[in-house]
UniProtKB/Swiss-Prot annotation:
One of its GO terms (biological process) is carbohydrate metabolic process. Catalyzes the cleavage of 5-oxoproline to form L-glutamate coupled to the hydrolysis of ATP to ADP and inorganic phosphate. SUPFAM superfamilies: Glycoside hydrolase/deacetylase. NCBIfam families: PRK05406.1-3, PRK05406.1-5. Keywords: ATP-binding, Hydrolase, Nucleotide-binding. It comes from Corynebacterium efficiens (strain DSM 44549 / YS-314 / AJ 12310 / JCM 11189 / NBRC 100395). The keyword ATP-binding applies. It catalyses: 5-oxo-L-proline + ATP + 2 H2O = L-glutamate + ADP + phosphate + H(+). CDD domains: LamB_YcsF_like (cd10787). This is 5-oxoprolinase subunit A. Forms a complex composed of PxpA, PxpB and PxpC. Its EC number is 3.5.2.9. One of its GO terms (molecular function) is ATP binding.
Amino acid sequence: MNPPHSIDLNSDLGESYGSWVMGNDEAVLDLVSSANIACGFHAGDATVLLKTVVAAKARNVRIGAHIGYNDLTGFGRRAMEYDHEVLVAETIYQIGAIQAAATTVGATVDYVKPHGALYNRIAVDEAQAAAVIEAMKKLNPELPLMVLSGAPIVEQAISEGLTVIQETFADRAYTSDGRLVSRTQTGAVHHDPQVAARQALAFATGGSITSIDGDPVTVHADSICVHGDNPAALELVRTIIDTLRAHDVEVRRAR
């Protein structure tokens, strides 16, 4: 008998490049069901990209193209202005790179998730969102787009015929209207594993979470993002998974 609830857990991986190491990808891949793999623009390089694709396939972890602004120096977290054609081309370029890597090992790219400043920008900016959507439609209109749950991009992408995966964050606080609390605000990040685990459980079961103002709020979740780029974060992910399993929630790929 299948568990009454299931949820996808995703994490940002493949972000090392050259001699610089970011995160503990092998450990995270043992825990999550989806891997957002950097495509070389905000982080990662050709060697790391292929290595991470191989590691994800070996664990039957779903592979996502983690596209970003062309900004290695700023780790893709700096706001940038783009001509429409350039953002379309760079989106195609990045997805194409990871698709090629996946093809060489008999794997497939199953979705696209923007990174950092691009993720935040297209959530609310119709013009940049349109460029990403256009690129995906040109390349593979069947490829789902993972975006912030409840953001304007959701309806925009659906109206253009894309499948949308709505994402929430276990370790981030939410406002009473279901938006992420800015990282500049005190209390924006949950460092207590138990708090993050309770929030993840609510997302997975359709329950309400507690906003930063103490109000109950329900946020739709097809996938939950977890971070595992340091030992403390890995422990948080393990606590989340233990809590989900204790409440009969299965961790598995989003449909």
